[in-house]
From Swiss-Prot:
Taxonomic classification: Eukaryota, Metazoa, Chordata, Craniata, Vertebrata
Protein name: Glucose-6-phosphate 1-dehydrogenase
Catalysed reactions, semicolon-separated: D-glucose 6-phosphate + NADP(+) = 6-phospho-D-glucono-1,5-lactone + NADPH + H(+)
Binding-site list for NADP(+) 2: 357, 366, 370, 393, 401-403, 421-423, 487, 503, 509
Keywords of this entry: Acetylation, Carbohydrate metabolism, Cytoplasm, Glucose metabolism, Hydroxylation, Membrane, NADP, Oxidoreductase, Phosphoprotein
Top enzyme class: oxidoreductase
Residue sites binding NADP(+) 1 per the record: 38-45, 72, 147, 171
Annotated D-glucose 6-phosphate binding sites: 171, 201-205, 239, 258, 360, 365, 395
Encoding gene (name): G6pdx
């Protein structure tokens, strides 16, 4: 077999550009204005400006694209550049291109609830080359408290009259079903659904997008992807650090609202959904909604909540617990860890537990989907066989691998755990996977909503978790303490075992490329 030749970034971007230009959705010849509402904030500085730069650098934006920052702070483009450029990862050869990029940037200061400020913003955009006819993309990098005023003023004052208009909305999309519906109803009264892009950056990650391809482009998985063969599904999100001085914001929402109700539930949908009629955005999202409608409200008996405490033998931040963060309210009962079991009550998945786990200050950084298969019927190996597992590792080190039994090498005739492994870093050497925001913002330029959350998806997701969240808010149960750097509360392991997950603890992954 001939060795695969790695493509350079220039070649990869060239192929993608060619595909974009040949398609009908990417309006290469049109003028576009990308407006960052909240341009002075952390999200804009660390994610949005760097992402727009990477797309511009790689020639993946329409040529006549302008970037306009808008915020209350009185800043200049130079100020924005000083704040954001450290996150750009610019090489010396890219410096001339960087100057071109910032030449296409401008900044307007104004209030979020003042129509006169938006008239000034609109006049500024109209004055750009072809500005009155330009397609306009508004990225709302703002707290939800100002969404209503901002969207109303955009719709009434700042819309392009001849080009298309799209808005990108960041989570959190409300705090519960009622507030989410209120926000959705307001935005839907101003914009059509095909103009609204509710962004969940996890839907832009390589392996999350790979779930559909793995499932529906491979014959081998179809016959076994059901309750007859799969014992349980575990969806995991782990961070090795705590709030580290940012606990005030986190405390408003907690880990369920921050991670479980959106990131993990979206991954669950991609695992559990039926094959869509096509890869059209609404065909895919229709199937995700069907899954969510089959999930009952989460039961408190199937939930474990935890909060990290300092590790006396740790170092640095690890010695601090959540309540030691000076920005966290005294005596807060907000959970920094949660495990919950959901059931998809349909013919394919009836009785199969979907275990969602997420937490801060844990023993590693990891996000993955793990399908554990049922025991082999008619055991002839004297209970030496462990369950097969299919693992899709989202981060770090993207990979797909299968835990399976093979004969132990040599004179033995005993089964041994091994794996079939596709680690992206080994198979696709020198291929730089794009950041999730790069994929998603490019999707907005192309008008593709497949990887964005539709209003009915959002409504069903909140329906599942709102009763639990209201009960937690009302009763403020004391979360179980767990040590910074541990696997989380042992009660979570007990919950997983109770619903059918088998943790063997005998398997050790060996990187075959380092033998």
């Amino acid at each position: 077999m001939a060795e695969q030749v790695a493509l350079s970034r220039t070649q990869v971007c060239g192929i993608l550009r060619e595909e974009l230009y040949q398609g009908d959705a990417f309006h290469q010849a049109d003028t576009h204005i990308f407006i960052i509402m909240g341009a002075s904030g952390d999200l804009a500085k660390k994610k949005i400006y760097p992402t727009i730069w990477w797309l511009f650098r790689d020639g993946l934006l329409p040529e006549d694209t302008f970037i306009v920052g808008y915020a209350r702070s009185r800043l200049t483009v130079d100020d924005i550049r000083k704040q954001s450029e450290p996150f750009f990862k610019v090489t010396p050869e890219e410096r001339p291109k960087l100057e071109e990029f910032f030449a296409r940037n401008s900044y307007v200061a104004g209030q979020y609830d003042d129509p006169a400020s938006y008239k000034h913003l609109n006049s500024h955009m109209n004055a750009l080359h072809q500005g009155m006819q330009a397609n306009r993309l508004f990225y709302l990098a703002l707290p939800p408290t100002v969404y209503e005023a901002v969207t109303k003023n955009i719709q009434e004052i700042c819309m392009s009259q001849t080009g298309w208009n799209r808005i990108i909305v960041e989570k959190p999309f409300g705090r519960d079903l009622q507030s989410s519906n209120q926000l959705s109803n307001h935005i839907s009264s101003l914009f059509r659904e095909d103009q609204i892009y509710r962004i969940d950056h996890y839907l832009g990650k390589e392996m999350v997008q790979n779930l559909m391809v793995l499932r529906f482009a491979n014959r081998i998985f179809g016959p076994i992807w059901n309750r007859d063969n799969i014992a349980c599904v575990i969806l995991t999100f782990k961070e090795p650090f705590g709030t580290e001085g940012r606990g005030g914001y986190f405390d408003e929402f907690g880990i369920i609202r921050d991670v479980m109700q959106n990131h993990l539930l979206q991954m669950l949908c991609l695992v559990a959904m039926e094959k869509p009629a096509s890869t059209d955005s609404d065909d895919v999202r229709d199937e995700k909604v069907k899954v969510l409608k089959c999930i009952s409200e989460v039961e408190t008996d199937n939930v474990v909540l935890g909060q990290y405490v300092g590790n006396p033998s740790g170092e640095g931040e690890a010695t601090n617990g959540y309540l030691d963060d000076p920005t966290v309210p005294h005596g807060s009962t907000t959970a920094t860890f949660a495990a919950a079991v959901l059931y998809v009550e349909n013919e394919r998945w009836d009785g199969v537990p979907f275990i969602l786990r997420c937490g801060k200050a844990l023993n590693e950084r990891k996000a993955e989907v793990r399908l554990q298969f049922r025991d082999v019927a008619g055991d002839i190996f004297h209970q030496q066989c462990k369950r097969n597992e299919l693992v899709i590792r989202v981060q770090p080190n993207e990979a797909v691998y299968t835990k399976m039994m093979t004969k132990k090498p040599g004179m033995f005739f005993n089964p041994e755990e091994s794996e079939l492994d596709l680690t992206y870093g080994n198979r696709y050497k020198n291929v730089k996977l794009p950041d999730a925001y790069e994929r998603l913002i490019l999707d907005v330029f192309c008008g593709s909503q497949m990887h964005f959350v539709r209003s009915d998806e959002l409504r069903e997701a909140w329906r599942i978790f709102t009763p639990l969240l209201h009960k937690i808010d009302r009763e403020k149960p004391q979360p179980i303490p767990y040590v910074y750097g541990s696997r989380g509360p042992t009660e979570a392991d007990e919950l997983m075992k109770r619903v059918g997950f088998q943790y063997e603890g005998t398997y050790k992954w060996v990187n075959p490329h380092k033998l």
